[in-house]
Amino acid sequence: MQVEEYLNDIAEREGTVHLTLIDPASQSPEAAAEIAKAAVAGGTDAILIGGSTGAVGVALDQTLIKIKEQVDVPTILFPGNAGGVSTHADAIFFMSLLNSRDINYIITNQVMGAPVVYKSGIEPISMAYIISEPGGTVGWVGDAKLIPRNKPEIAAAYSLAGKYMGMHYTYLEAGSGADRPITPETIGAVKHVLGDNKLIVGGGIRDGKTAKICADAGADMIVTGTIVEETDDVRKKIEEIVSAIKK
């Protein structure tokens, strides 16, 4: 089964997919593998690997190798640039940062990375990436024109543009470590125009209650990353979030 099909099937059967994001720059490959193992034990459906800075080269490859030794769920690249591609992953979110002011994040990095993805056989999953306030590091690095929190219609317009350009997934991002997540109003407005296309929401989600609010508003997939770096019990925290968003 292809990774995209796997994720879509979980979304249909269980209501919401949970993805754990691990940044190779934040810990050793061995520590990353232990986090992934605990997250899978807690019920996460797949592991995202990537970050805004430093998630490239040997650190990325070794992190993927160690993670795949410990878990059986899909590993999906979440690249910050063309250097964030590794042949050791199962799939890649092949994305365009639609609200960037920098053409490198809209298409140039994608052009540079596409031949590598093609030759490696990694499964590409097309995705519109949209960053909302507060934006965090990724908003700064990606030079994003942040979507205002109180303007869901703007997020919906960007999402619709991505859908019409053929992108299967839309990712609404508040930024890693954000102090608050995407608003339910924005999630609902975006899901309304996306229809059957899948909506991913990440940033500022630290507990089951917040995750459930996002899922109930229309998120098909929930991403948590910073929390697995901060908590003393990864499995317990992931269990809390997963139990809140599944049917």
From Swiss-Prot:
Mg(2+) binds at D23, S52. It catalyses: sn-glycerol 1-phosphate + (2E,6E,10E)-geranylgeranyl diphosphate = sn-3-O-(geranylgeranyl)glycerol 1-phosphate + diphosphate. Its cofactor is Mg(2+). Pathway: Membrane lipid metabolism; glycerophospholipid metabolism. GO terms for cellular component: cytoplasm. SUPFAM superfamilies: FMN-linked oxidoreductases. Sn-glycerol 1-phosphate binds at Y171, L172, E173, A174, G175, S176, G177, G203, G204, G225, T226. It is found in: Cytoplasm. GO terms for biological process: glycerophospholipid biosynthetic process. GO terms for molecular function: magnesium ion binding; phosphoglycerol geranylgeranyltransferase activity. Keywords: Cytoplasm, Lipid biosynthesis, Lipid metabolism, Magnesium, Metal-binding, Phospholipid biosynthesis, Phospholipid metabolism, Transferase. Its EC number is 2.5.1.41. It holds the Pfam family PcrB. PANTHER family: HEPTAPRENYLGLYCERYL PHOSPHATE SYNTHASE (PTHR40029:SF2), PTHR40029. Belongs to the GGGP/HepGP synthase family. Group II subfamily. Prenyltransferase that catalyzes the transfer of the geranylgeranyl moiety of geranylgeranyl diphosphate (GGPP) to the C3 hydroxyl of sn-glycerol-1-phosphate (G1P). This reaction is the first ether-bond-formation step in the biosynthesis of archaeal membrane lipids. This is Geranylgeranylglyceryl phosphate synthase. The lineage of its organism: Archaea, Methanobacteriati, Methanobacteriota, Stenosarchaea group, Methanomicrobia.
